[in-house]
Amino acid sequence: MKKTSLNVVAAALALLALGAGATMALRFDVHKRKAPAATALFAQTFSDADGRMQPINQWQGGVLVVTFWATWCAPCIEEMPDLQEVQAEYATRGVTIVGVAIDNASAVKRFRDEQNIGLPLLIAGAAGTELIRQLGNPSGALPYTVLVGRS
C-alpha cells in the first residue's frame, strides 16, 4: 500500500513539474522569441566609447556574447574582468564578448580607461532597455547577458 501511495505522489509531482514547465514556456514564449530577438540584436548600431559607430552585425557568424551593463551597476562592474578573461581565453575559437552600456559615453570611457578594459564597449543609453526587453528580459534588470550561436 505504501508503494502505491509513493507512486501516486511521484506521478502527481511529475505532472505538476510538467505543467509548470509548459506554463513557463508559453508565458515567456521562448521558441518564438529566438529568431526575431537575434534579428533585432543584429539590426542595432551603437557608438563605442570613442564615438565610432559599431554595427552589432559585424560580429555575426561567430559566437557572440553580449552583456548589457552600466557603470552604476555593481554586479556589472564586478563581472567585467571575468568577461575580459573569458574573451582572452576563447577569442581564437571565434568567441567575441561585447559590452552594451545602458549608460553615457563619458562614464563608459572613464571606466574603460581606469580599469583597462579591452572588450568592445558600446553605448546604448536608456534606449538599450527596450532592446533588453525584446531579448527576453522583461524587467530590464542589469547585468543581462545574451549568447548568440554561430547560426
Stretches found by the model and what they are:
Residues Q54-A74, L83:
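Short active-site neighborhood of thiol/selenol oxidoreductases, capturing the structured segment around
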Residues I77-N116, A126-R133:
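Structural microenvironment flanking redox-active thiols in thiol-disulfide oxidoreductases
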Residues T71-E78, P143-Y144:
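C-type cytochrome heme c attachment motif
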Residues Q44, F68-W69, F111, L119:
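Conserved hydrophobic/aromatic "anchor" residues
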Residues W59-G62, T92, G118, G140:
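Active-site acidic short loop of glycosyltransferases
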